[in-house]
């Protein structure tokens, strides 16, 4: 059966170090729970899949080594805004802080193959039994004709137009950056400014507040954004 015809319980595998994740995916292939390929952290293609999935998306975030543990809770918090997240961690990693950050489950990545597959499949079943969607898609549908042509801008647009809760600029910088470093605040400001310029001729703008060195994005709004309305 062709790879694209297979439906997996997991929507996307995100890796903080793809070459270390590849052996895990090969080992798990016979269990039919994980896609055959992973995406790097910050992949616009991966986020696009998550943002357009009809049911609640499920992401496996693979953390191949202890060098990635510092600040991992911030990554989980940001990613959990667009997907349910199962985190595969090195042995002896404390799960409590990751669960508090929004992880649906935290599993040692050296868990026996069948047990790991069962726990991931159980997470998918639990998501499917939930009655309420994780995030509303009404705004994304309403503003679909306004989506930019550039793919990276499309992802930012989709994130903000389908937001079910406010986005802190620090979370966006982390989500849109690489495994090694987040996107700079200046780069995010430039990207959101370009998006705003595209939306304004249609009477739409980003809804946001800026205070104490932190910008919080709420979504899209008809008319000027919060900062401009307050001037």
Predicted segments, located by residue:
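Alpha4 helix (beta4-alpha4-beta5 surface) of REC/receiver domains from two-component response regulators
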Residues: 90-105
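DNA-binding patch around the recognition helix
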Residues: 130-151, 189-231
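Receiver (REC) domain switch/output surface
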Residues: 106, 115-130
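A Lys-centered signature of the CheY-like receiver
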Residues: 109
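Conserved acidic segment of CheY-like receiver
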Residues: 2-42, 59-63, 86
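Conserved phosphotransfer microenvironments
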Residues: 21-22, 43-83, 87-94
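Receiver (REC) domain switch/active-site region of two-component response regulators
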Residues: 112
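Short amphipathic alpha-helical recognition elements used for nucleic-acid or partner binding
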Residues: 146-179, 195
């Amino acid at each position: 059966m062709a790879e694209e015809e297979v439906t997996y319980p997991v929507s996307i595998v995100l890796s903080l170090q793809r070459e270390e994740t590849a052996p895990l995916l090969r080992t798990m292939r016979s269990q039919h729970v994980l896609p055959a390929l992973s995406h790097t952290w910050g992949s616009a293609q991966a986020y696009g899949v998550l943002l357009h999935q009809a049911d609640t998306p499920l992401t496996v975030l693979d953390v191949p080594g202890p060098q990635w543990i510092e600040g991992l809770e911030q990554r989980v918090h940001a990613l959990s805004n667009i997907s349910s997240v199962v985190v595969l961690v090195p042995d002896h990693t404390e799960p409590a802080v990751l669960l508090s950050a929004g992880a649906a489950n935290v599993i040692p990545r050296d868990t026996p193959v069948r047990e790991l597959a069962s726990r991931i499949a159980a997470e998918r079943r639990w998501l499917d039994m939930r009655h309420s969607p994780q995030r509303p898609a009404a705004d994304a549908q309403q503003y679909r004709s306004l989506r930019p042509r550039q793919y990276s801008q499309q992802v930012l647009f989709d994130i903000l137009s389908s937001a079910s809760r406010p986005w802190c600029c620090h979370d966006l910088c982390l989500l849109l950056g690489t495994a090694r470093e987040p996107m700079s605040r200046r780069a995010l400001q430039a990207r959101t400014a370009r998006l705003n310029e595209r939306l304004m001729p249609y009477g739409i703008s980003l809804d946001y507040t800026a205070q104490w060195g932190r910008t919080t994005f709420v979504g899209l709004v008809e008319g000027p954004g919060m900062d401009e309305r307050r001037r």
